Amino acid sequence: MADPGDGPRAAPGDVAEPPGDESGTSGGEAFPLSSLANLFEGEEGSSSLSPVDASRPAGPGDGRPNLRMKFQGAFRKGVPNPIDLLESTLYESSVVPGPKKAPMDSLFDYGTYRHHPSDNKRWRRKVVEKQPQSPKAPAPQPPPILKVFNRPILFDIVSRGSTADLDGLLSYLLTHKKRLTDEEFREPSTGKTCLPKALLNLSNGRNDTIPVLLDIAERTGNMREFINSPFRDIYYRGQTALHIAIERRCKHYVELLVAQGADVHAQARGRFFQPKDEGGYFYFGELPLSLAACTNQPHIVNYLTENPHKKADMRRQDSRGNTVLHALVAIADNTRENTKFVTKMYDLLLLKCSRLFPDSNLETVLNNDGLSPLMMAAKTGKIGVFQHIIRREVTDEDTRHLSRKFKDWAYGPVYSSLYDLSSLDTCGEEVSVLEILVYNSKIENRHEMLAVEPINELLRDKWRKFGAVSFYINVVSYLCAMVIFTLTAYYQPLEGTPPYPYRTTVDYLRLAGEVITLLTGVLFFFTSIKDLFMKKCPGVNSLFVDGSFQLLYFIYSVLVVVSAALYLAGIEAYLAVMVFALVLGWMNALYFTRGLKLTGTYSIMIQKILFKDLFRFLLVYLLFMIGYASALVTLLNPCTNMKVCNEDQSNCTVPSYPACRDSETFSAFLLDLFKLTIGMGDLEMLSSAKYPVVFILLLVTYIILTFVLLLNMLIALMGETVGQVSKESKHIWKLQWATTILDIERSFPVFLRKAFRSGEMVTVGKSSDGTPDRRWCFRVDEVNWSHWNQNLGIINEDPGKSEIYQYYGFSHTMGRLRRDRWSSVVPRVVELNKNSGTDEVVVPLDNLGNPNCDGHQQGYAPKWRAEDAPL
């Protein structure tokens, strides 16, 4: 039964009006615009009604004005969009515009009417035929509309994070048999898919389209390909969605990607991810684990190495052979904050690798350059990481084999530490950290790194064992060789042609001197070849700075050998070569000044002035000389071939410079200009100048620019260089002193190196497999007033007691406390230098706090002896 409140029902064949007021407010079912589209069809100009329409009886709906009359402006030519008139007309209708959507969501939108500019057809309305309509029949469902997606539309949707706009994407892909990894959905320049695009456009760390995209990729059957699709351009080549999720610090997306099969060993090798010195911006080791470590995300590091899906192998190396530890060393910059997190992450990874892979030590892995993380830290000057590695002390028994520092014994503030010398001092078997620090001149702070314990004490021990004696023997030997060379050159015969006969005793002494000089030249030749071309750390800068004396010795040896060859060949020009060798040989004696602190900085000053200040001065001065010489020589009158005779016609000569200009005038004039620069020249050539005024003007400007300006600038620059070297004289001498020690050690054969090797073989605990952990260690005795011996993992309970251990089946006894050197005291009390064979000095400890402690006074023995240890 019909409700009495219902409005009048339309007659069959009429269009029912919706209930409500005349203004068209919504009170019933809205008139769909898709049905309105059926009203317009036919050709242009067909405006008459059909016979059926003309003959139908009038109904209640006929009181409504004609549609063409109400839309008379919408059917005219030039009106682009009839929907504007539809929205602005006063026609009482319930047609409501649909919600506005993005322009690239689909090609058709219910609730709106779009008129494409290319479609210029005029429409006429179509008469709606009378259809019997059941009052309770459900409204017909609109036909399903298939949206169209392309790369711009898809990238715009994921950038906005709109999941609703992704409705229909799966149907579109399945219908057209497409996938999200197809080329049409990739960025042409980079090969980027929509997943990295979504990860790069997060809002508060989230983008709701990411799970939807992964679900669609799973349903289309290319989940792994979609997740692991890398960038393909040269700039970001190899980067995947997992790299981006880690860089954006989104652990939830990292977990989601790994759970769906992301490659945890994908390598980002693009130019952007290269070191700065190679044109890159941020090098992190290419691998996702290295990226998480280098961006200080320990929670992601733990997940990548311990997740149940696919664990990241911590031993994996990148294209440079670097592990995650190498990558951490590479990003260190010696600042406090950076060093703190790098060292903490370094220990976390090292200990984790030891627990996951007990048979492997991540710290011993070498990269393509043959460098371990410790060597890399030394070569790049990362002093914070370097000091942390060599002084690392692990107290946990399970991972104590990773320690490089062990406390042998402790008593109060005094403790004796054993430092592992592996990689630090290798006795020539392989590249050592000590050689890298000394011979690599690219390290600006290497003098600071040489002061780090145990490097500092290791150098002192080498100097005491063999360095000092060998150095002074070399000094005496070289001076004797140069004296012999000088006497041999001074007493060379002046008559006859070489080789000269040997008849008298003086001649035989000269022969002995020549043989000794030739042998020393050959010896220097081969040793210089070994040092220059077989050095472990070669380089042009290292050659001219650190290896300058080796280069000079090489030139000296070549001159000596060439001079001897010319002498034996009977060429008198051997004398010219010999005198150059003689001068260079005496200049090379400056090398031995580095053994003394008072004279060690002079050679450095000379090197810096020669290669820095004097080189720049000579470059500018040479340009000035050539320019002024060319101009002044041009002003001289050319010489003629006519002879000029005296008044009595007795002395006739052809005029030459300085009276005129001939072919050799330019070179002679350069020498005269140099004399003017140092204030020794004359003006004899002025009389032969064509324009004397111009000639004098040029000479005056030359003297002002060179003698007054350039020379004084050179003096000022040299004074500044000397001042800088003097400020750093201690560090510079320490570096030269270390270079001298290593030069002496490298000149020894292998068996002598091992005989003079510093340190001792010590059992420091148990290795990972339970066997005794025996290492070559170096002992450093230290004093620290700010940290006391509580809960220390010491080896010996009795301070200073001898330890007897077995080594290759033989019994060896370690010496007692060999060096009672108190260093690193905070505050520093005193520094002791051990004198071999004598008692140690008294250490005054008065006025260091309250002498009474716990009701009694604690004191120290008046003398601290190596034989009477402990205290």
UniProtKB/Swiss-Prot annotation:
The keyword Heme does not apply. Signal peptide: none annotated. Keywords: ANK repeat, ATP-binding, Calcium, Calcium channel, Calcium transport, Calmodulin-binding, Cell junction, Cell membrane, Cell projection, Cilium, Glycoprotein, Ion channel, Ion transport, Lipid-binding, Membrane, Metal-binding, Nucleotide-binding, Phosphoprotein, Repeat, Transmembrane, Transmembrane helix, Transport. N-glycosylated. A 1,2-diacyl-sn-glycero-3-phospho-(1D-myo-inositol-4,5-bisphosphate) binds at R249, C250, K251, N296, Q297, P298, H299, K344. The chain crosses the membrane at residues 470-490, 508-534, 548-568, 573-593, 609-636, 694-722. It is a multi-pass membrane protein. The keyword Amino-acid biosynthesis does not apply. One of its GO terms (biological process) is positive regulation of intracellular protein transport. It holds the Pfam family Ion_trans. It comes from the Eukaryota. Residues 116-129 have a biased composition (Basic and acidic residues). The modification Phosphotyrosine is found at Y110, Y253, Y805. Residues 1-68, 110-143 are annotated as: Disordered. A motif (Selectivity filter) lies at residues 679-682. CDD domains: TRPV4. Residues 1-469, 535-547, 594-608, 723-871 are cytoplasmic. Residues 491-507, 569-572, 637-665, 686-693 are extracellular. Residues 812-831 are annotated as: Interaction with calmodulin and ITPR3. Non-selective calcium permeant cation channel involved in osmotic sensitivity and mechanosensitivity. Activation by exposure to hypotonicity within the physiological range exhibits an outward rectification. Also activated by heat, low pH, citrate and phorbol esters. Increase of intracellular Ca(2+) potentiates currents. Channel activity seems to be regulated by a calmodulin-dependent mechanism with a negative feedback mechanism. Acts as a regulator of intracellular Ca(2+) in synoviocytes. The ANK repeat region mediates interaction with Ca(2+)-calmodulin and ATP binding. The ANK repeat region mediates interaction with phosphatidylinositol-4,5-bisphosphate and related phosphatidylinositides. Homotetramer. Interacts with calmodulin. Interacts with MAP7 and Src family Tyr protein kinases LYN, SRC, FYN, HCK, LCK and YES. Interacts with CTNNB1. The TRPV4 and CTNNB1 complex can interact with CDH1. Part of a complex containing MLC1, AQP4, HEPACAM and ATP1B1. Interacts with PACSIN1, PACSIN2 and PACSIN3 (via SH3 domain). Interacts with ITPR3. Interacts with AQP5; the interaction is probably indirect and regulates TRPV4 activation by hypotonicity. Interacts with ANO1. Interacts (via C-terminus) with PKD2 (via C-terminus). Belongs to the transient receptor (TC 1.A.4) family. TrpV subfamily. TRPV4 sub-subfamily. This is Transient receptor potential cation channel subfamily V member 4. It comes from Rattus norvegicus. The gene is Trpv4.
